[in-house]
Amino acid sequence: MLKREMNIADYDAELWQAMEQEKVRQEEHIELIASENYTSPRVMQAQGSQLTNKYAEGYPGKRYYGGCEYVDVVEQLAIDRAKELFGADYANVQPHSGSQANFAVYTALLQPGDTVLGMNLAQGGHLTHGSPVNFSGKLYNIVPYGIDESGKIDYEEMAKLAQTHKPKMIIGGFSAYSGVVDWAKMREIADSIGAYLFVDMAHVAGLIAADVYPNPVPHAHVVTTTTHKTLAGPRGGLILAKGGDEELYKKLNSAVFPSAQGGPLMHVIAGKAVALKEAMEPEFKVYQQQVAKNAKAMVEVFLNRGYKVVSGGTENHLFLLDLVDKNLTGKEADAALGRANITVNKNSVPNDPKSPFVTSGIRIGSPAITRRGFKEAEAKELAGWMCDVLDNINDEAVIERIKGKVLDICARFPVYA
């Protein structure tokens, strides 16, 4: 018999210590990795529930196992909320991750060797949009598109590449692009050659849910997202579509199960359902509006302090600092800021002379600090501290001074009060 009072602390001290140390790290460090966020205790309650015990291969009402009457309710809630939130008429909530959602789209729409037009990873794209080290680059013929000299997506180049290479699918979306994407323009280009438009909105899904960023669902044939990042839910994936193409929906469902996955993670799907409900609340819209304001506030400080921001600003939750003129690498900046309890990630910048393991830039995102309650004043103060560290990257006294300020502001703005 399993006793409810069983716990990790009494049984596995080594594991518990690591878990507790991570909890402390999250509370005492400022998180600026654009893809990270803090999920709610309600989501964590769902993920720690007895739903983790249930196998449920198939879809609601069409399971391969018995005893699914209640997990059917859970999954249908998640499906219905996803459709309502994003204005879709199809949703699949089973993908274990954004990458697996993307894999399902590829396998549903394409054959190995088909040509795909995707954003260059070095200019803001994602691994699954055609990187040679990823399944997408290994299985498909990838033609990359990029950005122009102003740092914006070059739609003219995209249209020319589409006419020249006749891809079967064009991918919109990014992992390190600070602008607004013209989804309608991308659909126009796709339609001109009879291609699918597939949008990966993982980074901006929360902003889209709150009407802070344009929604691709009315324009794309298929849309995927993660459920964490700006959406602030559990780690997982989601596929959406609109337009009533039932054959397409069947292909997408089959590509997730049984093609790419077996049993869905019902405890995670419950977490998705909770997060999607939270995203419908008025305070979520206020949160996302503040995410955008905080990113802009930080950019203003970096520009005033003489730092180069790729594209000159941001229109979403993230931006890239180009450190080439500062004679700093992204790796050095990442490490120095880390010593001050400020977490970022090194990131390639356009025309980066350094390798992806070193880079010449860092990516900065505002979702997590905004979740803590930071507003423009705190965001600007933080950006100033970061400039102090980067201006004095080898001065440990400066770094220690900033670390003290970080600890103070973290105590004033706890993650979980």
Swiss-Prot record:
Signal peptide: none annotated. The modification N6-(pyridoxal phosphate)lysine is found at K229. Its EC number is 2.1.2.1. PROSITE patterns: SHMT (PS00096). It is an enzyme of class 2 (transferase). One of its GO terms (biological process) is glycine biosynthetic process from serine. (6S)-5,6,7,8-tetrahydrofolate binds at L121, G125, H126, L127, S355, P356, F357. Pathway: One-carbon metabolism; tetrahydrofolate interconversion; Amino-acid biosynthesis; glycine biosynthesis; glycine from L-serine: step 1/1. The keyword Transferase applies. The keyword Cell division does not apply. Belongs to the SHMT family. PANTHER family: SERINE HYDROXYMETHYLTRANSFERASE. This is Serine hydroxymethyltransferase.
